[in-house]
């Protein structure tokens, strides 16, 4: 059935106009953006399939090639979907500019949507001013943390250049398990020693997983 064949009061566009976006399901909102379906499936069916297969959160992180594996999603629609979520991420970043960090929860919330590929480990450095506000988020390395591969110079170089008062290390665990590995502990100790020499405080090292985090400071592993 085509969307045009729906009763007028059940069409997503008409319901949007009458009741606002909050009255629509995620699939209906996506259908309004993508607009047209195929001969076999109307766009609402396609959007329902997308969301039932992947969910909204996973959909936000899919690339163009992955999106096009779903019937009815070609290059143009894949780009539209990607553009929607990219705008949302940019709004999130804008709202969090100069956010004051009071604990690991703030770090976890700030980093939502910032890891480009959650199948790999990414190490980020957050630069903080004297008010503990984030002034910059810098990605330093991609891949498993290893003390022999991470040089303090690379971690502190931008912080020195921008006169950061302190930094926070953040990296993700693709497995979702936030328990630190021996390598994580070695890297933390190495950079803590370097911070004392450089006189830029290492406030915390936060490991983020799918639904939580581990803070070295909050677990008394970083005094």
From Swiss-Prot:
Q: Which Pfam families match?
A: RadC, UPF0758_N
InterPro entries the UniProt entry points to: MPN, RadC_JAB, RuvA_2-like, UPF0758, UPF0758_CS, UPF0758_N
Location of motif JAMM motif in this chain is 171-184
List the PROSITE patterns hit by this protein, alphabetically.
Answer: MPN (PS50249), UPF0758 (PS01302)
Task: Share an example GO biological-process annotation for this protein.
Answer: proteolysis
What residue stretches are annotated with the MPN domain?
Answer: 100-222
Regions annotated as coiled coil: none
Please tell me where Zn(2+) binds in this chain.
Answer: 171, 173, 184
Q: Recite the UniProt keywords alphabetically.
A: Hydrolase, Metal-binding, Metalloprotease, Protease, Zinc
Q: Which GO terms describe its molecular function?
A: metal ion binding; metallopeptidase activity
Family, as annotated: Belongs to the UPF0758 family.
Matching PANTHER family: DNA REPAIR PROTEIN RADC, UPF0758 PROTEIN YEES-RELATED
NCBIfam families assigned: PRK00024.1 (NF000642), radc (TIGR00608)
Q: What is this protein called?
A: UPF0758 protein Cvib_1178
Which species is the source of this protein?
A: Chlorobium phaeovibrioides (strain DSM 265 / 1930)
């Amino acid at each position: 059935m085509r969307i045009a064949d729906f009763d007028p009061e059940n069409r997503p566009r008409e319901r949007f106009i009458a009741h606002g976006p909050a009255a629509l399901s995620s699939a209906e909102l996506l259908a309004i953006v993508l607009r047209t379906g195929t001969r076999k499936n109307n766009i609402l069916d396609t959007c329902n399939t997308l969301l039932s297969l992947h969910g909204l959160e996973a959909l936000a992180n899919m690339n163009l090639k992955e999106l096009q594996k779903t019937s009815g999603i070609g290059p143009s629609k894949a780009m539209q979907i990607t553009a929607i979520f990219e705008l949302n991420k940019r709004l999130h970043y804008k709202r969090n500019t100069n956010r004051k960090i009071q604990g690991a929860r703030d770090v976890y919330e700030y980093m939502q949507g910032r890891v480009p590929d959650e199948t790999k480990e990414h190490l980020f450095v957050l630069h903080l001013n004297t008010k503990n506000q984030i002034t910059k988020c810098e990605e330093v390395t991609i891949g498993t943390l290893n003390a022999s591969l991470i040089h303090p110079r690379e971690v502190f170089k931008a912080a020195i250049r921008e006169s950061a008062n302190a930094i926070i290390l953040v990296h993700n665990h693709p497995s979702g398990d936030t328990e630190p590995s021996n390598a994580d502990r070695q890297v933390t100790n190495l950079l803590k020693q370097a911070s004392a020499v450089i006189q830029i405080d290492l406030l915390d090292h936060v490991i983020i997983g799918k639904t939580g985090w581990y803070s070295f400071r909050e677990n008394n592993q970083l005094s």
